């Protein structure tokens, strides 16, 4: 017997080997080793509990899809995706929408402590009786094959987004509980108040469209308030966002994810939520933008992060995060307005400098997203004390003038609030200022045109130390950043692959969102290229893959762009004996 069991938890995913042998007449005729963990996972009416502790699920949906090869990616790529979810995006859960996914992916979730909601395959359609019998068989096979994975906390036993079918779904729930009475069942639907036969009411909540609240309260969705409730999808098709969309669109995409996360965090009886989705993916003719690509991800197809990815990664504490929603180029904004600029960070504070002059120190309490551990913080001051220090005005007049100019920058001339006009009237009456005076000051302190280049610097501060710095200034030089998932590959039960993620950056490490130049690939040695030899970056991002060919040795991938030059990545390939 196992003594003093170490429980499996996200922060300490302790695993055990279970060795099983089959004996006949004193002779062992078969044996196997399974890896599993010990934990108690359960849903209650007020949320999800792991080992007796309440845990809010914050996850993303994942398709098992890759550029050029579809679902035919080996173990290394499955592992890579799990690592991205946990270590880059900082989520604590994933939904394998809408089918069971690679054992290699789920095994990696076991190893790194990533919680999993998995379900049997299907989407909206329910067929005839023969079809239903096959669906039940699919469910049986899924549970038998996957039930030893401690990361799996919920079985999906309803065809995703299908209509109610009580006879069918009573059977799927019966089978699931018969084969595994330790896990709850759920059933993803887009229907409110539908027939609840599962243990958990799981619902795709697409209420938020930029105007409506981030989510429905539980009472408006589930027919039984005593049963647990979970949001299985949100956003996604409500606001498709391409990497090469303009800055305002990309920012709105990120803020919508923050809106939903914040709304869910304010509802104590919602177990958690899964955003749609982890990355963009190939799709059928009815979706996409005429190119059969769903731009629903917080990452692009190659797993390069969009701005929205930072909303998730900023909720973890292990890695410093600081992303600016803006390049600080006024020409990217209609009318030159700088409204809607955000700092997405997990820092305690962010110091903002303009041409080495401290403008303002922002704190996490300045975020309107009070329910999040680290909500996005609006940039609402471009002036600081500059007018007080540089203009021949009375201190109070200078401060009022600064407020006026910041309001103009934040709201834009066509959306100014009533308090702006009251403030302008006060400056005119009390200090005899004229509109042309304000225009001149705006040009000097906010507009940034006709003067020397403006350099903005943002410092993320944690525990009194600067942990990350972002600099925004007019781009002088572009270069390619290349990130390779692994340089050592192994030809084993299948070919092996390496993901190559590419971004065009300026000299300060900022993504060049409109660098859509061609990039050429050349492979030498024991590797093959997956995909075309030439691509065009989209939104300054792209990628490729290389694969093994059955041979051991060295391989070289050359990446070339006419503007940035060549980069060579070297690989070593071994064969598994």
Predicted segments, located by residue:
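Substrate-binding/catalytic cleft of secreted carbohydrate-active enzymes
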Residues: 81-87, 93-341, 356, 364-366
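Secreted/periplasmic carbohydrate-active enzymes, especially glycoside hydrolases
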Residues: 1-100, 107-108, 113-116, 138, ...
